[in-house]
Amino acid sequence: MIELFVIKDTEWLELVAESVSLEGHRYQAPRSIEATIVTKQGDQTYYSVSEGDTVLFKWKGKELFRGIVFARTPDEHTLAFSAYDMLQYLVKNQDMYVFSNQRADQIIRRIASDFQIPTTSIANTGHTIKSLVIKNDTTLYDIILKALKQTKSQTGRHYQLYSEKGKLGLRAWPDPSEVWVLETGVNITGYQYSTSINDTATRVVLRRQKDNKTYKASAKDSSGLNKYGVLQYTETVTDDINQAQLQQRADVRLAEKKGVKKELKNIQAVGIPEVQSGLPVYISIPEAGIKKTYWVDTDRHEFKGTKHTMTIDVVEKNTMPEGVS
């Protein structure tokens, strides 16, 4: 079932694969594989790979990955290697830029051209960014995310970088009307689910210093106070905002922090190649009271022989994590 090739100028050479792991992380480019191949068996030698080679992985005849070998661990009879798709070049390279009156897609095309990264379809993002100044050396990936974040704040449209057949692309973030279903007793073999109030707040207090005065805004969860007692979250705000905006932020913080926090992770299941980070999946775990759609945050697919399993972590909302550009 595993088909693994090293692509040369004039031919594809098939590798003797023992196992392949394919993984990805939402908002953490790129996707990657770790593979173990047989290079020698008795007097018989087989094709191998070197750093910089392009490898292609297929499962049941469908291409799931194409990327560049970055690391190898040779052994007497086998070789383990890691390969990354084209988004690796956005992470590995840094630069400083000044963009004026450019759309995010135009910024991507400029960066790809400067760093000789081949491209496929790049969606027109519509919104013109008046100015984007990158004064310090910053990864190309973070520069692009800054442009995409500004675009989303102005248009509400969400875009995704991807790698396809060795080329960098940009598309509207997929939100399919039909999603895969994972269910205990059907295709889920294990999971970790926990609930906690360790990070819960029943009262929020924000403070801001200005002109030797302290401005304060607070919000409380009356139901939570009665049930869990006082669990106060405090924050000093440095942004230049007025009292109404300070109160609004306090209300937002309370909405984020009130109630019991639920965490669903390490979901182990029968492998489905299409279940990848950044895509929605419907999860049914009746014994935990879970029947809803989540977004895949991380995915790791394991292939060996004819067996395919996967482990995923999920999030409830497909929002940019704090700290992302």
Swiss-Prot record:
This is Phage-like element PBSX protein XkdQ. PANTHER family: PHAGE-LIKE ELEMENT PBSX PROTEIN XKDQ, POTASSIUM BINDING PROTEIN KBP. To B.subtilis YqbQ. InterPro entries: Bact_Kbp, YQBQ-like_dom. Pfam families: YQBQ (PF24032). Signal peptide: none annotated. It comes from the Bacteria.
